């Protein structure tokens, strides 16, 4: 992925400096310029460190969102970093939330194949 580094408290990297929204948006922008047809995600980690992070990722060239579709009962077992967003929502709730947020920025979520 192309998200910011977000430390997890139970890893050897727990005290490492977290990545920033700005660094991530610059990288997304550069990738979009270099690879116009690439599938570039606006990651959950970007949305975790900034409330509008995923939306800003799209505004800087990202074109993929990766919702958490794992059953709520097992999501804690896949906790890559602390304070991850959307861990308490059911898959359908997450999809509805993503749709509303995308529409607010003039985007539409599709579930088609992403290749060209």
Predicted regions and their residues:
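Auxiliary Fe-S-binding modules of radical SAM enzymes
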Residues: 1-116
